[in-house]
């Protein structure tokens, strides 16, 4: 009997506190606080700044062009002509050519 009273009181306090927080959130915007006509300017970080926990300086603008591959040059093999297609007896579909070589997802 005493535990049900305690649970009812705690539930009542929970609902009241929730109601207070919601009412402050909804009606807190209509308070009579003065609006600042001159907001503070946005602070921008320089291009070279120090990140704590790192030994090196982090550069925001970095030129990645030396690392980009030349799009005109291709290291991939040329596609073989589609003359020798075989049917897989297990699945009854055409066998696919599986590329060989290192996995491109691993460096």
Curated annotation (Swiss-Prot):
**What span is annotated as the signal peptide, if there is one?**
1-25
Q: Which residues carry this modification: Hydroxyproline?
A: 99, 102
**Skewed-composition ranges (Basic and acidic residues):** 87-97
Glyco sites are at 29, 102
User: Which region ranges are annotated with the description Disordered?
Assistant: 79-107
Q: Which GO terms describe its molecular function?
A: receptor serine/threonine kinase binding
Q: Which UniProt keywords apply?
A: Developmental protein, Differentiation, Glycoprotein, Hydroxylation, Secreted, Signal
Please provide the Gene Ontology terms (biological process) for this protein: cell-cell signaling involved in cell fate commitment; maintenance of root meristem identity; phloem development; regulation of cell differentiation
This one is known as: CLAVATA3/ESR (CLE)-related protein 13
Which species?
Arabidopsis thaliana (Mouse-ear cress)
* Gene (UniProt): CLE13
